[in-house]
C-alpha cells in the first residue's frame, strides 16, 4: 500500500531518498529524489490556529448576535465533512486584497482554495505567495488545478523529471494539495496511482479528479462533449476506490461535466452509485451552479463536500446553515446533533 495521508500528516519531518521510499507500493519505480522536507499539514485545513482565534459569526453568537435563530451550526475546522472548496483566479482576477475581502467576511465557511488549471503559473511569485499565505492564515488549504495534465503531455522525453520539478516548485510555493486530473488524457490506472504516490512522497496531498466525461474540465462546448460520449460509471467508482483504499488518498473530486453540467438530464444515478461505494468524507463533488449544490444539500444533507466558485460561497453557507434556500429547501435543511 502507499503511504497513507494520515501518516504523512502526523509523521513529522522525513527526508525522501533516492530510489524506492519506505512503504511505497510495488507500482513505484526508483526515481530521482525530490529534495524536499515533508512538513505536516492536514488536507482538511491548512492551519487550525486561525480557526480558534476567528471571531464568532453572528448566527452562532447567542449573547450578542442572532444565535437565537434556528440554524445548523457549522463544525469547526479542520473538517472532513461539510467541506467547501472555492475556485480562486480563473473567471475573475483574484489578488491578495480581493481574497482578503472574501476570507475576512466568509473565511469561516471556506476550507480550501483551488487555482483552476495552471492559472497560478501566470502570477509573479510574490503575489502568488501572498495569496497562499493569506489562505493559510485563515485555515484554508491551497490546491492546484489539473495542470499536471499539461506537464505530462508536454514534457518531451523526461516526464518523470518534469513531474518532480513541478511538485518541488509547488511545494516550495506553499501549495498543500495537487489535483490529479486526466480529463484530457488517456492514462493507465496504475500510472495514475503512481502519480498519487509521487505526490505523497513529495510531502503534498493528491486530489485525483475523476469523471465520466472525457474532454471535461476546460472550455469544450456541450455539443463536442456529447459527441465524445461518456465512460461507464463503474470505471470511475473502481478507480476512486483504488485511490482511497489502496493509495490512502483522503479525498477524490468528482468532475461535474457529464453528470450535472453540459448534459440534457442530470446523471443522479452516477452520484448515488459513487456514494454507495465510498464514504461521504472521501468524496467532493463539483457543483458549478446554485441549482446543483441546492440538489446535493437537499439529497445528502449539510455534510456533503462541495467545490463551488468563490462568488457562490455566501449562498452555499446560508443553505448549509438552513437559513435560506430555494422553494424545495427553504426551511427544510436541518440536522440533529445533541
Please state what every model-predicted region is:
Residues 54-79, 275-338:
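C-terminal alpha-helical cap/extension of soluble enzyme domains
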Residues 100-108, 126-139, 164-174, 195-203, ...:
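Acidic (Asp/Glu)-rich catalytic clusters
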Residues 53-130:
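Conserved N-terminal beta1-alpha1 strand-loop-helix module at the mouth
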Residues 114-122, 145-147, 167-168, 175-189, ...:
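Catalytic beta/alpha-barrel core
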Residues 80-84, 112-114, 139-143, 176-179, ...:
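Structural preference for beta-strand elements that scaffold enzyme active sites
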Residues 1-56:
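N-terminal mitochondrial targeting presequence
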Residues 95, 121-134, 153-164, 182-208, ...:
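Active-site-adjacent beta->alpha loops and helix N-cap segments on the catalytic face
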Residues 80-98, 116-121, 143-162, 185, ...:
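Active-site mouth loops of central-metabolism enzymes
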